[in-house]
Swiss-Prot record:
S-adenosyl-L-methionine binds at G170, E171, S202, S224, L225, H226, N302. Reaction proceeds by a ping-pong mechanism involving intermediate methylation of a conserved cysteine residue. The gene is rlmN. Keywords: 4Fe-4S, Cytoplasm, Disulfide bond, Iron, Iron-sulfur, Metal-binding, Methyltransferase, rRNA processing, S-adenosyl-L-methionine, Transferase, tRNA processing. Its EC number is 2.1.1.192. This is Dual-specificity RNA methyltransferase RlmN.
Length: 382
């Protein structure tokens, strides 16, 4: 009876983990840096292509290791230049990765889970429930796939991916260890060399893990707020029943204090018609955030079938924004991108749609918005 050896996937190993791996097979630690550059800088998954590695070591690696990212199921490009990849992970589920170009900046929105357990009422991802956590290789693999698609070398002036946001499918803090490992690779010069200021983790408010985050990594933090009081947030973001606003904001303040350098929290606020878009909500928000240095990103709701919510009018959004501006806040309104390929914020559901169905979906969305189309007020890419 023969037994097959489970190969180590090198794609998700951080530098210390890679060095430990080479130690364990009797090789010098500097090999870790060589192999990491081939994997992350040049997108190589074939050990024979690693020409500065000896043939003997290449043969050894082929027997015990692999470089395996998620399977690309589809890649779509929006009319506005936004790209969306649907990738299949080991659990069999599909997740989505979105690239948003804007001038010299290219932001990659990365998923951390297949599905999501938090069940935010306005988010299409939450409607499908939780399926699985992604491995570190599956999280960083989304960056690897996108980078290979562009043929871009990280840490160069003309690289395609300048920013990464953990704002795709799932709650990153509920897949803590794998997300931390992937973010370290994003920032490592042997990985993707992205500045800590340009890597952002977005959370709905898992308070104990926000406190834990500061012990492990230094990245920008965004809070999915969406409501200015506990009663409303309990309805929109059910985890608020466990970690109410006072507790949540105090944890964010503690985290931001560890960063220093005058960095501020980003507040994300999805605007829902007649639910949280009134001036009195803005007034409540001003009072709520008075002790929290922050910038505010208003996100007009992106419709999806059977959501039960609508996007507010242009005037309602402007009134809300003006109220916050008058209180001294830096407020932007996010421009919807990738709507024709279901890549807009809140629309990620991990499904593969054929072109006819996607076209029908886009027409329906345009009709929903035609009566009161929102012009570009400002653009914020975190």
């Amino acid at each position: 009876m023969t037994t097959s050896t489970v190969k180590t996937n090198l794609l998700g190993l951080t530098q210390p983990e890679m060095e430990k791996f080479f130690d364990s097979i009797g090789e010098k630690r500097f090999r870790a840096g060589q192999v990491m550059k081939w994997i992350h800088h040049f997108g190589v998954d074939d050990f024979d292509a690693m020409t500065n590695v000896s043939k003997a070591l290449r043969d050894k690696l082929k027997a015990i290791a692999e470089v395996r990212g998620p399977e690309v199921v589809s890649e779509d490009i929006s009319s506005d230049g936004t790209r969306k990849w649907v990738v299949r992970v080991a659990s069999g589920s599909c997740v989505e990765t979105v690239y948003i170009p804007q001038g010299k900046r290219g932001t990659l929105c990365v998923s951390s889970q297949a599905g999501c357990a938090l069940d935010c009422s306005f988010c299409s991802t939450g409607k499908q429930g939780f399926n699985s956590n992604l491995t570190a290789a599956e999280v960083i693999g989304q960056v690897w796939i996108a980078n290979k698609s562009f043929g871009s070398v990280p840490a160069t002036v003309d690289r395609a991916i300048t920013n990464v946001v953990m704002m795709g499918m799932g709650e990153p803090l509920l897949n803590f260890d794998n997300v931390i490992a992937a973010m370290h690779l994003m920032m490592d010069d042997l990985g993707y060399g992205i500045s800590k200021r340009r890597v952002t983790l977005s959370t709905s408010g898992v308070v104990p893990m926000i406190d834990e985050l500061a012990k492990h990594i230094d990245v920008s933090l965004a809070l999915s707020l969406h409501a200015p009081n506990d009663a409303l947030r309990n309805q929109l973001v059910p985890i608020n029943k466990k970690y109410p606003l006072k507790m949540l904001l105090e944890s964010c303040q503690r985290y931001m204090a560890t960063l220093g350098e005058k960095r501020v929290l980003t507040i994300e606020y999805t605007m829902l018609k007649d639910i949280n878009d009134k001036v009195e909500h803005a007034v409540e928000m001003i009072e709520l955030l008075k002790n929290t240095p922050c910038k505010i990103n208003l996100i007009p709701f992106n419709p999806f079938p059977h959501s039960g919510y609508e996007r507010p009018s242009n005037n309602a959004i402007r009134r809300f924004q003006d109220q916050l501006h008058q209180a001294g806040y830096n407020v932007t309104v996010r421009t919807t991108r990738g709507e024709d390929i279901d890549a807009a914020c809140g629309q990620l559901v991990g499904q593969v749609m054929d072109r006819t169905r996607r076209s029908e979906r886009y027409i329906a969305v345009r009709e929903l918005n035609a009566a009161d189309d929102l012009p570009q007020i400002a653009v914020n890419r975190i």
